[in-house]
């Protein structure tokens, strides 16, 4: 599980669902939350929190592509290949982000340690966890 520190920048709410935009040290990510500031008082601009997302929810494209919305810039730190899948650890300004990709996609990307990479995370895949004081 990936975990990045963040802070709520903005909240848009409609019919019990909120799009919560959060700043991290590596860029901005958005989360879909099935709650509102009225029903969950911790959903407030300025609230510090953790953004959580699974390794299988991280998309990768070569650095500079920026075709992915909700994208963080990173650098490949290490690649561990298995029979079917590969675990790619990337350094970002917000900390390490790990992606789990199939080996076919890894071969197409032709990644090596030190390569620049863009990392995308779909808003529905990002969970928010309030920081306790």
Residue ranges, per PLM feature:
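A generic beta-sheet turn/junction motif
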Residues: 15, 24-26, 53, 83, ...
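Short, conserved beta-turn/loop elements at beta-strand boundaries and strand-helix junctions
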Residues: 11-17, 79-85
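Glycine/charge-rich catalytic "coupling/switch" loops of P-loop NTPases
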Residues: 2-5, 10, 28-29, 36-78, ...
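Glycine- and charge-enriched low-complexity intrinsically disordered segments
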Residues: 82-97, 112-115
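Short, acidic/hydrophobic/Gly-rich beta-strand patch recurrent on exposed beta strands
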Residues: 19-25, 32-33, 87-93, 100
